[in-house]
Amino acid sequence: MASRPDGDVWNIVDNDKDSQHYGRNFKFDFSYISSEEIKDVGKDYVWQNYRVGNKVLKRLYDEIQNHFKWFSMFADTNSIHSLRKLNNINIDGFVSFLHTTIAPKRKRPLAYTSQKVALDTLKSVIRWCQIHRPNDVPATEIFTGNEYIGVNRKLKIDFIPDDVVAQINEALKKEENPYLKYGIIILQSTGMRIGDLLKLRIDCIKPHLISGYTIEWTQHKGRKDKAPMPVRSECVAAIEKLIEVTAELRSEADEKDKDTLMIWRVPQGRGTGSVSVISPQTFSQNWFRDFIKYNNIKDANGDYYNLTSHQFRRTLGTDMLSKGTNINVIQQVLGHSDPSVTKRFYADVKDKE
């Protein structure tokens, strides 16, 4: 498809074989944007970034379908029909709008992170236009850069406390869901992202040239293959168990999923009975929530621990730094694009412990 699609509704299939959403159809619906001028900018932003590969399709979908809608609502309320005349007063108004908006589904104020990502999406669209459509955006700077920096800023380091790790490990001994049990062991051992875990291949383990084994996987966020990394025997055993558990399902899986480790037979809901890759929501929301409550895993305040998949990644990095591991080695293990990214997340860990 060489030219921009017509109409307000686009169906674009992710044909990037390195994408964790390969084969998924993304339905873009721009009809919620009232202003034809702003709508045209939004369409161009999506199409041009997709066409040249600047952003993955899922990222563009989230930006336009989930995050940009808040600005569209603000624009409608304030009779804003163009990005060209936006100024800092409008941006302050948008921030106030985000502070006071009630999310329709949750019936609660927007979370701080949701507010920030809504503003970041607007920034991203305007920054792109400054290069590619300069006549459609303000010529002067309208963002101060500190709209969402302050007392409400979320602490970046979010590792799992040692006492909670101990509770998790004890609960894993009797966990009957093999995907959850062995998946957590893999996350603990490698620090990989949840999307990479769910797209792990059955041939990811290779013998090390000297001793033991290494693991390889595709880092979908950075769109590159991870360099072979030495891995503990527990992780190797976990992967072998999952290969064994899923062996009989492979003949029923789609061709693109036959060599994916985390396939299962969908027990209920859409696709019941079919064999497919486990979704991030099933693994890191539904299963984590049930795992924590069933095993009564609580934090220091006596509340159920709010476990996320990314915390295993942060915990691995924190443990390595606390043991004196060089920041560049941690960067390589976690697959950060640059050591500065690793330093930003982990430089002050010891002071916070």
Residue map of PLM features:
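Charge-rich, intrinsically disordered N-terminal extensions
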Residues: 1-145, 151-154, 167, 171-172, ...
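Extended accessory and catalytic-adjacent subdomains in large enzymes
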Residues: 142-353
